[in-house]
């Protein structure tokens, strides 16, 4: 690959290179069409001088493999990576947003509520990375992407390395931006994940003040400030606008001694939230809810659309001028053209046009009405969880995505259950129902919970689980014991009436999602990050890997009364069945299914599946070759599904913050 002559129009393996988006010291970024899947992607091609370096290839392969398994919502996943004709590549999605650096440069400091809301999301991304042995090493505003609805992503994990294998990174290399580098980065002391916490505290301070933590006229003086000077006090720099309690949060996050910092990025985020005034806490929560719902609506794009003039809702002193470019020569991100939200016949039409210029977060702080989540302008940006920093500036274009509307009027047989307390950050995720008709839901968030709605009740109960981190799958057995997976890579159980939870002895889980329990008490887990399904028999301390083959991001698992196991093989767009006590795997004849997610099976062997992208629930009768769509209405990103003995179907309607049931 030449650094001077782009390869636009040429073929790179299965990729047709459509447009050069950016060029950096290590390679180029292209808008490309994956001709196998007929979708537009972001493709990073690493230059020959690095692709030919065995040490570099080993490092990038290790980092891409590790970071590519990070499924935390605030980390952008990669589709694929590898080598073609000796050249290393990384394929990623295109998402919408602008860098935090651009927002701060154009509009100045954020409100405390918005600053904390963004930092809480980045903290969740860091905690997920740290739990997998990955340190980012370059947390800064340039590497934080914020959408028009304030959903935040941490990008550019290309300089990150697996903490357990330092041999792949040269010792002593100063990687990152000096403004956000922890003191130990300059002294040769051991650098741990807490360097990321220091950087996040620096970012929080800059969000509150509009300036990096230390001002210096030389690199040497800047390093000395990190080593010797006290942390800045935002409340002194912006008196009356920043709560003084945030000064202590910044000070602890930027402690010179790593051991004196917060134990986790999440702890820093919680402390920052607690330091806000009550009014600001409500504003921050509103921002988080809106960002989650809007992002769940915006499905990763597959095809291109015509461009139109666009602006983005920013932060600070005023709205941007419609049509103005938002990327400046400091932004380490690449803006690409807009893509369709769903090209497979989903009910998310797209069209060109403008939306209100007033920032959503600013509206929240002023108490004005917030426009519908669908009325958002889009700036399509290329980011990657395992990509190197490639700086590029291009003009942005956008379009409107109309949110599927739904009416409080229920379809025949459809009912919204009276759950409360699940409308915060990616909720609900899992759903289960016991033999008595009690319904359980995981309220997914940075620190989540399990909520129970008793039969006939209009009030909910929070079960006494503790320490759950983004709980996912949920199941309940005949005795009323509740099982839940979370992103601590574990399965936790709570017996009926007990306050003492138990962690089951599963080993090596990597982002477990779906969960099921059979009539014998055996527990099944869709171990998404490892592309497998594991089983733990009742009373056993040793798990078994079930002999499924070719799984790609399995999300849901179910088991019937005969012991047959069913899995939604999400990225392969199929549902597979493993017959009891055999190696016989069968692909079920669901019709044109896309992104299957949740799965359940009733006593008659009918299989129910949610389609994540098309907002449908489909069922396949035992022995049938034709699936049918259930008459749910207004679903928005349905995830888990459950069915009771009366064949009433329950769905976690995540994008609408509700649980819906449909009677047979």
Curated annotation (Swiss-Prot):
Residues 403-664 are extracellular. The keyword Metal-binding does not apply. Residues 2-381 are cytoplasmic. Keywords: Acetylation, ATP-binding, Cell membrane, Kinase, Membrane, Nucleotide-binding, Phosphoprotein, Repeat, Serine/threonine-protein kinase, Transferase, Transmembrane, Transmembrane helix, Virulence. It catalyses: L-seryl-[protein] + ATP = O-phospho-L-seryl-[protein] + ADP + H(+); L-threonyl-[protein] + ATP = O-phospho-L-threonyl-[protein] + ADP + H(+). Induction: Increased expression after 3 hours of phosphate starvation, no protein detected after 24 hours phosphate starvation (at protein level). Part of the pstS2-pknD operon. Autophosphorylated. Dephosphorylated by PstP. NHL repeats lie at residues 414-456, 457-497, 498-539, 540-581, 582-623, 624-664. ATP binds at residues 21-29, 44. It is found in: Cell membrane. The modification N-acetylserine is found at residue 2. It comes from the Bacteria. Its EC number is 2.7.11.1. Residues 15-276 form the Protein kinase domain. Homodimer. Part of a signaling pathway that enables adaptation to osmotic stress through cell wall remodeling and virulence factor production. Phosphorylates the osmosensory protein OprA, which inhibits binding of OprA to Rv2638, leading to the regulation of osmotically regulated genes, including the ESX-1-associated virulence factor espA. In addition, directly phosphorylates the alternative sigma factor SigF and its regulator, Rv1364c, which regulates the SigF-Rv1364c interaction. Can also phosphorylate the FHA domain of Rv1747. This is Serine/threonine-protein kinase PknD. The lineage of its organism: Bacteria, Bacillati, Actinomycetota, Actinomycetes, Mycobacteriales.
